[in-house]
Amino acid sequence: MARMPSGRVTSAKIVIAGGFGVGKTTLVGSVSEITPLTTEAIMTSAGVGVDDNRQVPGKTTTTVAMDFGRISIDRDLILYLFGTPGQTRFWFMWDELVKGAIGAVVMVDTRRLADCFAAIDFFEHRHLPYLIAINCFDGNQYHSAQDVRDALAIPSDVPVVACDARSRESTKQVLISLVEYVLTMRRQRAATPA
C-alpha cells in the first residue's frame, strides 16, 4: 500500500453498502478495532413483503440507520467505516452517510446480484469511487471476479475482490484495496490536464 507521509495521521471515511443481509454489519464488526456502533433492530411485520430474507432465513435483525467502526491501517492512516442500511425504505439516509467519504465498498452476494445494483448506481451517479467485494458465504458457489464484473456490467477499472466478511484480515485487505484504488484515481486525475 502507498505510504502516507510519516508523522502525520490521516483519517478517511469509507462507506460499506449493498443489499439486505449481504454482510455489511458483519464486515464492520469483524474489522473494527473498537466495539462497533450498530443500529440493529428486531425485524418486524413492517418488513413483510418488502425485505426478501429467503436467502438469509436465520436473519432476525436488520440495520435501521447505520453501522460505525474504526480501523487503523497503519500508524498513519485511520479509516472510519459507515455501514448503510440495506432495505430500500432506509435509502433516504444514504446521501447523509456518504458526505465526506473517499470511497465505498459495495458488498455482493452472488445469489442475489440484483440487490447491489442500486448501490452501484448510487455511487456512480455521485462519482464516488467504489469497489465490489464478493462476500463468499459458506456453501455459496464461487464466481470469478470477471464473471461478477460482467454480470454487473461495471467498468474495467473498478476493482472486484473476493472476501469473507467474517474475517478481519480478509476485510482489511478489501479496505486497503479501496484506499489504493482511490489514491490511484486521484493521481490519474491530477496528472490529466484540465
Predicted regions and their residues:
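Conserved beta-strand segments of the P-loop GTPase G domain that flank and frequently precede/overlap
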Residues: 81-84, 104-109, 132-136, 162-164
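Inter-motif core of Ras-like GTPase G domains
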Residues: 87-111, 121-126
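Canonical P-loop GTPase G-domain recognition
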Residues: 138-194
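Conserved nucleotide-sensing/catalytic segment adjacent to the nucleotide-binding pocket
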Residues: 52-88, 95-98
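Acidic, low-complexity intrinsically disordered regions
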Residues: 1-2, 193
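Conserved C-terminal guanine-recognition region of P-loop GTPase G domains, centered on the G4
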Residues: 107-157
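Conserved G1/Walker A P-loop phosphate-binding module
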Residues: 2-56, 70-74, 78-80
